């Protein structure tokens, strides 16, 4: 009986990994609404991701956008007419927006948590940076992530109303000039 249980558990785990990998391989774009929590602050908005390395998120209440254009990551604050630039490779988003990183993580590592609703994987790099990625256990939909920002704040990002493989024009990932704000 114990052998059967262990065999069926490992088969089940291998089966969901295979399905998750297949689903990710066929995902080229994601559009979704989000809830972002940093400390006690909650923000809402919408995002578009186009693999590899493109992302745009709008925070309507804050009049703020973030854009990853493949090389740079920019935080655009329209209210203050400011743009802050960062090398994309130095941010946790680089690991999230490069689909091969996620596929490698799933193929080569076991989930850190599997509960009744969620599958969680954790990516650690440079011995201190962590990115936790969450998937729905039943649908295998991407649910969100958790990381730490440059100021050591925990950042949780939860997705809802997800649309997969819709057409997203590349021009939305253009970082504006400061005079255009």
Question: Which positions does each model-derived feature cover?
Answer:
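Short hydrophobic/aromatic-rich beta-strand segments that constitute the beta-sheet cores
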Residues: 34, 55-59, 73-76, 121, ...
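Short, solvent-exposed coil/turn segments at beta-strand boundaries
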Residues: 26, 48-54, 68-72, 116, ...
């Amino acid at each position: 009986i114990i052998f059967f249980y262990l065999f069926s558990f490992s088969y089940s785990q291998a089966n969901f990994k295979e399905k998750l990998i297949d689903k990710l391989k066929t995902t080229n774009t994601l559009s979704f609404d989000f809830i972002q929590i940093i400390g006690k602050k909650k923000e809402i908005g919408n995002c578009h991701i186009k693999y590899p390395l493109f992302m745009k998120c709008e925070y309507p209440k804050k009049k703020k956008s973030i854009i990853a254009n493949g090389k740079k990551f920019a935080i655009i604050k329209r209210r203050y007419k400011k743009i802050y630039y960062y090398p994309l490779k130095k941010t946790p988003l680089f690991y999230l927006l490069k689909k091969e990183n996620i596929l490698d993580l799933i193929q080569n590592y076991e989930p850190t948590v599997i509960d009744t609703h969620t599958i969680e994987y954790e990516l650690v790099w440079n011995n201190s940076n962590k990115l936790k990625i969450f998937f729905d256990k039943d649908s295998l939909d991407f649910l969100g992530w958790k990381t730490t920002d440059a100021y050591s704040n925990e950042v949780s990002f939860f997705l809802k109303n997800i649309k997969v493989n819709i057409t997203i024009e590349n021009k939305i990932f253009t970082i504006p000039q400061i005079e255009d704000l």
